């Protein structure tokens, strides 16, 4: 009998009823919510006279709509209504939350792990497509729609069809100047944004083993850009050490770890598809187009037009085949988002700007992903490094990742961004987004254009 993957083991643990190949009813261990996808779900509960079945397994935070300057000055009517409504709903339904402006508030996919609520073995959902981030801990985690949010509120369960399994093995040692963001951007560039459709993606290999938990979260975060709702990794000592001592960690921690150690893929586990990437051959990545697969290694020319999507992307981005990343005239730099706004990301970026100043006519902002990260960074003096270099140092939130709050890239301006999506108008109407690592974004801020971080003294 073939061995089981970590996903198989967790699926079996949470299966309540249902036949294979059909929707199956799954138990949910942790439900994260934010202000955008929860209001209608709460209203549905009220209309039906229902309560939240397990408020103790539900946690809310404010992230998408919150301003990162003057955080209480919310001028957009819809944004203010959503924030006010979540404040009302968590109070009415008795749900623990990181209140707007509180010392815990931040992006949901950062606050969850920081509180210790994200743990190996859990089945986690949230009304947000980047919920796969939590899979880095050895959890099943994926985004759901608002009607499903209401279903989880009412029943603590969700109907799901078990996906196929894909194994992506990252092997080898990356060159200096190549980071986990480059791993996932390279994967998407090689195989496309639909390669993971219908699959859960398990990321493994010695290159994954050597990453920190924060670096692992970056990879799982962008599973959805690879086409998969779910990304997962096997937990190890780094995982246990990250969770230990946090408020939400299990009280009997040693017993929990003993259980978690059984939740790893068997050596003979079977997968429907296997991809292997040698990271020693990778280079810093930069996207040129309007989906994350439209990316190249630094120094490579942008590809020839292959179809209408390429033609439209080039027209929107005001670029052309044969150009290179270093040819792009940047106007904005954004270091933040649930992909790359953790403390280690800010530390990395700060190395490239310390003692320097951003290029003229450039706007650069740093948005820590949570209040704890901001406080920790300030204790280390990172805020001063960034501000002395001409960056704006902001309060936590989703910020410029998406145009749902005051932080937007102006029409027609090119932005080097550490976020996860480069769709048309994603960062504001007419914004031209180039996805990259925090190192590439920080170095670009100083030079005014993309440069090869592998050649800079900061990586030597």
Curated annotation (Swiss-Prot):
It catalyses: (2R,3S)-3-isopropylmalate = (2S)-2-isopropylmalate. Pathway: Amino-acid biosynthesis; L-leucine biosynthesis; L-leucine from 3-methyl-2-oxobutanoate: step 2/4. [4Fe-4S] cluster binds at residues 338, 398, 401. Pfam families: Aconitase. SUPFAM superfamilies: Aconitase iron-sulfur domain. It is an enzyme of class 4 (lyase). The keyword 4Fe-4S applies. Its EC number is 4.2.1.33. Keywords: 4Fe-4S, Amino-acid biosynthesis, Branched-chain amino acid biosynthesis, Iron, Iron-sulfur, Leucine biosynthesis, Lyase, Metal-binding. Gene3D superfamilies: Aconitase, domain 3 (3.30.499.10). GO terms for biological process: L-leucine biosynthetic process. Binds 1 [4Fe-4S] cluster per subunit. The keyword Transmembrane helix does not apply. One of its GO terms (molecular function) is 3-isopropylmalate dehydratase activity. Its cofactor is [4Fe-4S] cluster. Heterodimer of LeuC and LeuD. Belongs to the aconitase/IPM isomerase family. LeuC type 1 subfamily. Catalyzes the isomerization between 2-isopropylmalate and 3-isopropylmalate, via the formation of 2-isopropylmaleate. This is 3-isopropylmalate dehydratase large subunit. The gene is leuC.
């Amino acid at each position: 009998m073939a061995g089981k993957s970590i996903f198989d083991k967790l699926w079996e643990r949470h299966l309540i009823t249902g036949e294979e190949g059909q929707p199956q009813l799954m138990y949910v261990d942790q439900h994260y919510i934010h202000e955008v996808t929860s209001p209608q779900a709460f209203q549905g509960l009220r209309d039906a006279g229902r309560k939240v079945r397990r408020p103790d397994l539900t946690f809310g935070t404010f992230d998408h709509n919150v301003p990162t300057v003057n955080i209480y000055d919310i001028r957009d009517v819809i944004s203010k209504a959503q924030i006010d409504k979540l404040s009302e709903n968590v109070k009415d339904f008795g749900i623990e939350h990181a209140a707007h402006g509180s010392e815990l508030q931040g992006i949901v996919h950062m606050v969850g792990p920081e509180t210790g609520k994200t743990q190996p073995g859990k089945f986690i959902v949230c009304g947000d497509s980047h919920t796969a981030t939590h899979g880095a801990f050895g959890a099943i985690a994926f985004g759901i729609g608002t009607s499903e949010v209401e279903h989880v509120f009412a029943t603590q369960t969700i109907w799901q069809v078990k996906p196929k399994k894909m194994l992506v093995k990252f092997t080898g040692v990356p060159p200096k100047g190549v980071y986990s963001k480059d791993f996932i951007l390279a994967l998407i560039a090689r195989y496309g944004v639909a390669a993971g459709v219908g699959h859960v993606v398990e990321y493994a290999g010695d290159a994954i083993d050597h990453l920190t938990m924060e670096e692992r979260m970056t990879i799982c975060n962008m599973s959805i850009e690879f086409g998969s709702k779910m990304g997962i990794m096997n937990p190890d000592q780094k995982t246990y050490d990250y969770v230990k001592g946090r408020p939400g960690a299990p009280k009997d921690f040693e017993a929990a770890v003993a259980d978690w150690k059984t939740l790893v893929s068997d050596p003979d586990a079977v997968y429907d598809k296997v991809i292997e990437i040698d990271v020693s051959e990778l280079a810093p990545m930069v996207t040129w187009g309007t989906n994350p697969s439209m990316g190249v290694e630094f120094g490579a020319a942008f590809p020839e037009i292959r179809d209408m999507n390429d033609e439209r992307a080039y027209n929107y981005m005001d670029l052309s085949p044969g150009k290179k990343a270093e040819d792009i005239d940047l106007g904005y730099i954004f270091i933040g988002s649930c992909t790359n706004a953790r403390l280690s990301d800010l530390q990395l970026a700060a190395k490239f700007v310390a003692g320097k100043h951003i290029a003229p006519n450039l706007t650069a902002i740093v948005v820590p992903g949570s209040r704890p990260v901001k406080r920790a960074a300030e204790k280390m003096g990172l805020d001063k490094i960034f501000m002395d270099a001409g960056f704006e140092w902001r309060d936590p939130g989703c910020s410029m990742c998406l145009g749902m709050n005051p932080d937007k890239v102006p029409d027609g301006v090119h932005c080097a961004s550490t976020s996860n999506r480069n769709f048309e108008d994603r960062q504001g109407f007419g914004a031209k987004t180039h996805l990259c690592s925090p190192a590439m974004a920080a170095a670009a801020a100083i030079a005014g254009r993309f440069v090869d971080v592998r050649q800079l003294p900061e990586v030597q």
